[in-house]
């Protein structure tokens, strides 16, 4: 089931949607109640560019942004068809996230089995097991904390305020209380 969800994610979103320079959505305005979608599953959060942006902000504060960056890089890698590009991306993923000298090393089992020699013959699912480990780490650790974080709750409140502005009667009652005191 998990692999199908990840595969579904791979097909739905082109790489450019998740790799905007600032991580923001190209539409500039998100659908109503996106936080409700984000809260329903990590998959839904990762399908939404604004959700990815907020999750990255949270993970950066937790010093674990490399997890979502690795996951996103693997999603992009799986969509690569050109063998030369695939080889270049595989080496970049390895050097950035998996090697002992990685600048943003992720903590996964089995990374030592991936050697530069294996990277010379890459295939789209070569990082799948490691990506699944990181997904599960995020799902059962970071994601639940994100949903309780000030960053998420503030975004949800802002979204609710934009959707449900106080009606005129409520505003009039507030005004009368202010001026009658």
UniProtKB/Swiss-Prot annotation:
The modification Phosphoserine is found at residues 24, 41, 176. GO terms for biological process: G protein-coupled acetylcholine receptor signaling pathway; negative regulation of signal transduction; positive regulation of GTPase activity; regulation of G protein-coupled receptor signaling pathway; response to amphetamine. One of its GO terms (cellular component) is axon terminus. InterPro entries: RGS, RGS10/12/14-like, RGS10_RGS, RGS_sf, RGS_subdom1/3, RGS_subdomain_2. The keyword Amino-acid biosynthesis does not apply. Residues 41-156 form the RGS domain. Residues 1-35, 157-181 are annotated as: Disordered. This is Regulator of G-protein signaling 10. It comes from Rattus norvegicus (Rat).
């Amino acid at each position: 089931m998990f692999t199908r969800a990840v595969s579904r994610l791979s097909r739905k979103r082109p790489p450019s949607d998740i790799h905007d320079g600032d991580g923001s959505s190209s539409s500039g305005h998100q659908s109503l109640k996106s936080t409700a979608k984000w809260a329903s599953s990590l998959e839904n959060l990762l399908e939404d560019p604004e959700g990815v942006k907020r999750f990255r902000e949270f993970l950066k504060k937790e010093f674990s942004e490399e997890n979502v960056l690795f996951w996103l890089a693997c999603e992009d890698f799986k969509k690569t068809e050109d063998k030369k590009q695939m080889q270049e991306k595989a080496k970049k993923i390895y050097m950035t996230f998996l090697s002992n000298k990685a600048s943003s090393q992720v903590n996964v089992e089995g990374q030592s089995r991936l050697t530069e020699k294996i990277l010379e013959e890459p295939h789209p699912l070569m990082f799948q097991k490691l990506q699944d480990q990181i997904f599960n780490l995020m799902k059962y650790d970071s994601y639940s904390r994100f949903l309780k974080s000030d960053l998420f709750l503030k975004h949800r409140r802002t979204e609710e305020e934009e959707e449900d502005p106080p009606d005129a009667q409520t505003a009039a009652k507030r005004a009368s209380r202010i001026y009658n005191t």
